[in-house]
Regions:
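ER/Golgi luminal nucleotide-sugar-dependent glycosyltransferases, focusing on the catalytic module
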Residues: 1-283
Length: 283
């Protein structure tokens, strides 16, 4: 059976204008993903009270999905900030229940990511996922060391969570006690969320890998082999569809494109798409 394709986009309302999210969304709507159709779920952690103005901004930004042939907006989820991106992902997965099945793909990205800047962006993650048997998680990049404030020397390899792809089979298995779902600090989000997510996948018997080092395939045992640190980064950052914000090129074109944010004014006036908000703060 042909799989479905999902995107879970995770952000927060600690900045008033969602300008980074706007450019990320417009890039997804502009560049063809290389798959037939994507179901988009957006989760917004409420760092502060969600204002009427912010609701209207999100509604305006999502108007572009009405014209995008390959993305359907399924829901915008408003949720408490506890658990940060990891509780956000969990809520997106809960919302996908009933539609997603085991072999469906789920691409997860947060506000620290940038892109995509080229077409075939979703397909590239799938290609890496399918290039080796028993894959459970594929990221843009991968890290072999622990957070320096904890400093463990083993069992800490992890896909960096600003952008990664997995399947419903692997992610739904984590729902009952999702990694990082109770995190309240950045350190807890890294250790209990980002690192633990990969470690749970590895403990299930599956493998993790990345687009940057496609031949470095880690399992529970090989993650601690010193030879892994010798794998070169054979894929340049400009060839990775979704990169960390620190890797985004900032030349003249970067600043010219920033002016495109003002196109949002037309979406504010011409709203045709009804956005469905799921406000979990009212439960």
């Amino acid at each position: 059976m042909k799989p479905n394709y999902f995107v879970a986009y995770l952000t927060a309302n600690d900045t008033p204008f969602f300008h980074i999210d706007y450019f990320n969304w417009m890039n997804m709507f502009k560049h063809h993903p290389g798959v037939d159709h994507i179901h988009l779920y957006v989760a917004i952690s409420m760092v502060q009270q969600f204002s009427f103005f912010q609701r209207k901004l999100i509604e305006a930004m999502m108007q572009a999905t009405a014209k995008c042939k390959w993305i359907t907006l399924e829901a915008v989820i408003l949720k408490p900030n506890q658990g940060r991106d990891f509780s956000s992902l969990r809520e997106c997965l809960i919302a996908m229940k009933g539609l997603a099945v085991d072999n469906d793909f789920i691409l997860v990205r947060n506000r620290s990511s940038r892109g995509p800047f080229k077409s075939q962006w979703y397909k590239k993650y799938i290609n890496q996922f399918q290039s080796h048997d028993n894959t459970g998680l594929v990221g843009s990049t991968i890290n072999l060391v622990d957070h320096n404030e904890r400093g463990l020397k083993a069992n800490v390899s992890h896909v960096q969570s600003y952008s990664f792809l997995s399947t419903w089979k692997h992610l739904s298995a984590l729902l009952d006690n999702f990694p990082g779902m109770m995190a309240s600090t950045h350190l807890e989000a890294v250790i209990d969320g980002e690192i633990e997510l990969s470690q749970r996948i590895l403990r299930s018997g599956a493998h993790i890998s990345s687009l940057q080092k496609p031949e470095m395939i880690l399992d529970l045992d090989s993650q601690n082999d010193p030879v892994q640190s010798q794998y070169p980064a054979v894929v340049a950052f400009q060839d990775i569809p979704i990169v960390h914000r620190k890797r985004e090129p900032r030349g003249l074109q970067f600043w010219i494109k920033r002016l495109g944010y003002f196109k949002l004014l037309t979406f504010l006036v011409n709203r045709k798409l009804k956005v469905k908000f799921m406000d979990l703060n009212r439960r």
